């Protein structure tokens, strides 16, 4: 059901040579970019009318309005299953605890007497958040996007999720209920690239946003790339990934269940086990069969994901080699199921999120650990981070110098300006001192 890659025996290659040996999904955003271009431009030129036409084309429902009425949000919350409401409320509570601690404070550094630099953190004015609604419905993604934006102090928050024909063109009621729980009352029935374009350009119903965040399919990722430079984005999120670094102490039942848990997202989802134990590899492979047979989404998601080129059991000589492999892979989710798992986890450099030991499965992080589940995919964990309060903040440097403080460093500024052949830069200093360079004290 899942392939094997044997990296034992020979020394592991370095850098890209090692990455090329590891499984990865085919996820070509560049190819999708040309297909989303006309969609985005239609929204630009036709506004709400284009959104309504695309909802009919892609979602099979003709909308009267893309803006979700307040009554629909209230009704969705009122009709929400009490157990689901309690679970969402706990997820929100835990997420707030973690994200509130991420707030940044203004800090001033006195560089010299009379000269200081202050770093002030300012939230983005307006954000557009996206919650997918394709194969599955993700109210948890509403929580993971809204909470850090709110804790960052963003004043204007809008959310989009695809129109559902089953619900009269509204987004899924659980999505709407999650919005109501979080106090988000600006919600739109728009999906995929159309939602990103709506937030980027603005329409008659929706003011443009400064930033768009949230997971989605390849069309969402392509639209984000299309608008890079015009608006801020969190990341071009691809199919979900789990990597498990495990040794002989790991429970194969746990490992198999965790691999399956992420494979059920998408046929392109990646499930990777890295281990130095052939016995564990055999046991996990054997355990996959009955667990897969006992769950849902077998033929359309789980089996294609596990059998795909993006999933594998990778055999290594030891935990040290396993660490090199998982760092080269840069998984969205990385579980450490080894002896002394915390110490091993401390050595990891590249991962979207790390889950330590047998009692911290990825599913916990998906819903209620308090961490954020909007994470870098496709190996981007080597340079990117998951969604956080920081994602919605901008650091502004405030420079405050007295005349004496400027005079003390003026000759250095002029020297560097002349070295770069930018004499007007130096002149801006000289102009303040009678067109002379003051002597430093």
UniProtKB/Swiss-Prot annotation:
It catalyses: L-histidinol + 2 NAD(+) + H2O = L-histidine + 2 NADH + 3 H(+). It is an enzyme of class 1 (oxidoreductase). One of its GO terms (biological process) is L-histidine biosynthetic process. One of its GO terms (cellular component) is cytosol. Zn(2+) binds at residues 262, 265, 366, 425. PROSITE patterns: HISOL_DEHYDROGENASE (PS00611). One of its GO terms (molecular function) is histidinol dehydrogenase activity. Its cofactor is Zn(2+). Substrate binds at residues 240, 262, 265, 333, 366, 420, 425. Pathway: Amino-acid biosynthesis; L-histidine biosynthesis; L-histidine from 5-phospho-alpha-D-ribose 1-diphosphate: step 9/9. InterPro entries: Ald_DH/histidinol_DH, Histidinol_DH_CS, Histidinol_DH_monofunct, Hstdl_DH. Keywords: Amino-acid biosynthesis, Histidine biosynthesis, Metal-binding, NAD, Oxidoreductase, Zinc. NCBIfam families: hisD. PANTHER family: HISTIDINE BIOSYNTHESIS TRIFUNCTIONAL PROTEIN, HISTIDINOL DEHYDROGENASE HDH. HAMAP family: HisD (MF_01024). Catalyzes the sequential NAD-dependent oxidations of L-histidinol to L-histidinaldehyde and then to L-histidine. This is Histidinol dehydrogenase. It comes from Streptomyces avermitilis (strain ATCC 31267 / DSM 46492 / JCM 5070 / NBRC 14893 / NCIMB 12804 / NRRL 8165 / MA-4680). The lineage of its organism: Bacteria, Bacillati, Actinomycetota, Actinomycetes, Kitasatosporales. The gene is hisD.
């Amino acid at each position: 059901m899942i392939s094997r890659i044997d990296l034992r025996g020979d020394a592991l290659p370095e850098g890209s040579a090692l990455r090329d040996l590891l499984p990865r999904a085919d996820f070509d955003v560049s190819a999708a970019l040309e297909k989303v271009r006309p969609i985005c431009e239609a929204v630009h030129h036709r506004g709400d009318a284009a959104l309504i036409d695309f909802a009919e084309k892609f979602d099979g429902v003709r909308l009267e309005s893309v803006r979700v009425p307040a009554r629909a949000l209230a009704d969705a919350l009122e009709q929400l299953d009490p157990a689901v409401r309690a679970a969402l409320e706990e997820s929100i509570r835990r997420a707030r605890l973690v994200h509130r601690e991420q707030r940044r404070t203004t800090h001033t550094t006195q560089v010299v007497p009379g000269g200081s630099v202050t770093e002030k953190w300012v939230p983005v004015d307006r954000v557009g958040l996206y919650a997918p609604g394709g194969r599955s419905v993700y109210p948890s993604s509403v929580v993971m996007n809204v909470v850090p934006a709110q804790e960052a102090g963003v004043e204007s928050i809008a959310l989009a999720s695809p129109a559902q024909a089953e619900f009269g063109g509204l987004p899924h009621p659980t999505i709407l209920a999650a919005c109501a729980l979080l106090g988000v009352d600006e919600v739109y029935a728009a999906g995929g690239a159309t939602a990103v374009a709506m937030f980027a350009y603005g329409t008659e119903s929706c003011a443009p946003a400064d930033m768009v965040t949230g997971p989605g399919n390849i069309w969402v990722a392509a639209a984000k790339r299309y608008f890079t430079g015009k608006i801020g984005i969190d990341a071009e999120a691809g199919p979900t990934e789990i990597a498990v670094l495990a040794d002989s102490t790991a429970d194969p039942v746990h490992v198999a269940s965790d691999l399956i848990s992420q494979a059920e997202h998408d046929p392109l989802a990646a499930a990777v086990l890295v281990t130095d134990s052939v016995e564990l590899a055999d046991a996990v492979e054997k355990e996959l069969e009955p667990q897969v047979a006992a769950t849902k989404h077998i033929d359309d998601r789980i089996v294609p994901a596990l059998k795909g080129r993006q999933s594998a059991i990778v055999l290594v000589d030891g935990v040290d080699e396993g660490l090199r492999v998982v760092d080269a892979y840069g998984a969205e989710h990385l579980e450490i199921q080894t002896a002394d798992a915390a110490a091993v986890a401390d050595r990891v450099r590249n991962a979207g999120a790390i889950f330590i030991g047998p009692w911290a499965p990825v599913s916990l992080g998906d819903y209620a650990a308090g961490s954020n589940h909007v994470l870098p995919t496709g190996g981007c964990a080597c340079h990117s981070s998951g969604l956080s309060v920081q994602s919605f903040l901008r650091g502004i440097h405030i420079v405050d110098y007295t005349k004496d403080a400027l005079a003390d460093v003026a000759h250095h500024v002029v020297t560097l300006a002349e070295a770069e052949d930018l004499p007007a830069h130096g002149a801006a200093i000289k102009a303040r001192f009678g067109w002379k360079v003051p002597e430093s004290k």
